[in-house]
Amino acid sequence: MNVFQLFIKSTYSPRDIAKTRFQGIGKAILYVFLLSVLFAIPTAYYVSTGTVKSMNGFKTVLNKDFPDFTISNGKLQTDEKKATESQANGFVIVFDPTDSYGTEQIEAKQNAIGILQNKFVLAIDGQAQEMSYSMMPSELQKKDVIAGLNQNKAMIVTVLSALIFLVTAAGKFIEVSFLALIGLIIKNSQKKHLSYHQLWKLSAYSITLSTVFFTIMRALEATVPSEFLLNWFVNFVILFLVLKEIPSKKVINKS
C-alpha cells in the first residue's frame, strides 16, 4: 500500500495497521512527518493570518495615529510630547516618547506593542519581550518601519509556519515513542513477540485517528474537553486493538 492508502486504512483498520510492523522504519518516519504537516496546518493558518492582520493593523495605526519619529542613538525622537494609546486587532499599541510607560505596564495589557523611549516591547498573553533601540540600525524612521513591515511580511509568516511545523513534528515523534513504550506493556500482557522497533512503527500508524480528529477540531476552532486525556485514550485503544490482531507467542509443551 502507498502512504495515502495507509493513511485511510489507519483511521479505521487495526488489522491493516498490524501489517505495518514488517515495513522499513524509514516509511514510518516519513508517515509521522506527514501527520505532523497535516496537524500543523490549522495552527499555522490561524497564526499566520492573525500575524498578518496584526501587522496590517500596526501599520495602519503607525500611519494614522502616530506622529513621525526617528530612532537614533538608542532613543525615540519625535515632536510629540505625550504618550498615545491605540488599538488594532486585539492589540494595544503604545507610543511613548516621554518614558511614562515601562515593560511592566505594557505586560499588564496582556496583548500589546510598546514603542517606548528607549526600547521596543511586545507582550503576548501577558508575557513581554523587549528589545533595546541600541540593537537597531544607527537611524530608523517611521517610514522605514512601515517599509520593513511590508517587505518582511512573507518572511515572518514563513518562519512562523516552519517553527510551528518543527514543534509539531517534535511533539508527534515524542508521542509515538512514548506510545511504543506503553506498547511494551500491552504486548507482554498479550504475550506478543514484538520488538520496540516494531512497536514504534505500529504506534506511528496508531495515532492517525486521533491526529485526524484533532486536526478537524482545530480547523473548526472547536474546543475539545480534556483533549490531552482523550488523545491518549484513543491512541491506547487503537494500539491495543492493533496488537490483538498479531498472533501470540507459540507455547511449546515439553513432554
From Swiss-Prot:
GO terms for cellular component: plasma membrane. It comes from the Bacteria. It is a multi-pass membrane protein. It holds the Pfam family DUF1189. The chain crosses the membrane at residues 28-48, 154-174, 199-218, 223-243. The keyword Nucleotide-binding does not apply. This is Uncharacterized protein YqgB. Disulfide bonds: none annotated. The gene is yqgB. It is found in: Cell membrane. Keywords: Cell membrane, Membrane, Transmembrane, Transmembrane helix. InterPro entries: DUF1189.
